[in-house]
A protein has these predicted regions:
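Short, hydrophobic alpha-helical packing/hinge segments within bilobed ligand-binding/sensory domains
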Residues: 46-48, 146-152, 167-168, 250, ...
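Predominant activation on well-ordered alpha-helical scaffold segments within soluble catalytic domains
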Residues: 20, 67-68, 123, 169-172, ...
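Conserved C-terminal helix/tail region of periplasmic/extracytoplasmic solute-binding proteins
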Residues: 273, 277-316
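Proline/Glycine/Serine-rich low-complexity intrinsically disordered segments
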Residues: 97-100, 127, 196, 200, ...
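Pocket-lining segment of extracytoplasmic ligand-binding domains
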Residues: 148-239
Length: 316
């Protein structure tokens, strides 16, 4: 069987481990797929333009900025699978005297950019907890790296920020006040994003890639040591781990949120669409499900493929 070369570009470094498991676990080869993996970190609009022009085939990500072009201009973007439905930047770094979300009223909260996915997540999270921007809390753009924002909190320049689990370790190491808060449903992580134009011309490759994705998720969730070996070998530089502990907590955090069956949850779609609608309020009435075509995953699921993988793990 001839290998297919699919041009895949990830939008965040945290996506790389699952793609590397697909590759180094042998699942791309197993299903007759070849992937050219590249980065479009911090290049949300460039990735969109390249996908639109057919200069790349699949984006891993671009979670909220495709609703507007689809809703307002009828562009053929589509999401085919979703690996994570949980917001994971749920570690609050706060000044002394702040012990939870309720204490952020009247305070100054910093994130990297409140038009980015990370910043918009915090806007929505605070809103869901009764804190409206402007009325109850001030949202300010801050440093890109969570640890740098944590330092600014400790210096009194901000009252609080939110970080992910690895940055939580680093913030605690420098003496920051770090509090775990509840999460919320959210479309994050590896999302298989493409266009209906590409899918219609490459259905076989799409099916094979999704089979490789399902296999990689199963491997990731059930073979901890082997997955950590792949992370250590192939992802340390891109993820910039500074210790084995950081690598381990990253892995455990990923495993806890990876979906065995890569469907989005309704609440996660609702929440990510709220981010898109904040940026483009004229599309409030648009149905976000228009962008989701899950029938390829459903085919794999209905065939019993995923259930057999996990049944074999339990009996093996």
């Amino acid at each position: 069987m001839a290998e297919k070369k699919i041009r895949v570009f990830y939008r965040a470094a945290g996506h790389v481990p699952l793609w590397k498991v697909m590759e180094e676990g042998g699942f791309l080869e197993k299903h007759g797929v070849k992937v050219e993996l590249g980065s479009r970190e911090d290049l949300r609009e460039k990735a969109l333009e390249e996908l639109r022009a057919g200069e790349l085939d699949i984006i891993s990500g671009n979670h909220h900025n495709l609703y507007a072009p689809c809703a307002l201009r009828g562009e053929p973007f589509v999401y085919l699978a979703q690996t994570n439905n949980v917001w994971k930047e749920n570690w609050l770094v706060a000044r002394d005297g702040i012990s939870g979300i309720r204490d952020l009223k009247g305070k100054r909260v910093a994130m990297d950019d409140f038009h980015s996915h990370t910043g918009l997540n915090v806007w929505l999270y605070l809103r869901l907890h009764g804190l409206e921007e402007g009325r109850d809390v001030e949202l300010v753009n801050g440093e890109k790296k969570g640890l740098d924002r944590a330092r600014k909190v400790m210096a009194g320049e901000h009252d609080a920020t939110f970080v992910r689990v690895v940055e939580r370790l680093r913030a605690q190491a420098i003496g920051a006040n770090v509090i775990e808060v509840s999460s919320m449903p959210m479309i994050e992580g590896v999302t298989i994003t493409t266009t209906t134009t590409y899918v219609n011309r490459h259905e076989d490759e799409v099916r094979r890639l999704l089979l490789a994705l399902v296999d990689a998720i199963h491997f990731f969730k059930t073979r901890r040591r082997d997955t950590l070996d792949i992370l250590n070998r192939s992802c340390r530089d891109v993820l910039k781990f500074q210790s084995a502990e950081e690598e381990a907590v990253f892995y455990d955090n990923e495993v806890a949120s990876l979906e065995r069956k890569p469907y989005p949850s309704m609440k996660a779609i609702q929440n990510v669409f709220a981010l898109a609608a904040r940026e483009n309020p004229e599309m409030q009435a648009f149905n976000p499900l228009v962008l989701w075509d899950l029938h390829y995953i459903r085919e794999i699921d209905d065939a019993g493929y995923i259930d057999r993988l996990y049944a074999q793990s339990q009996t093996g």
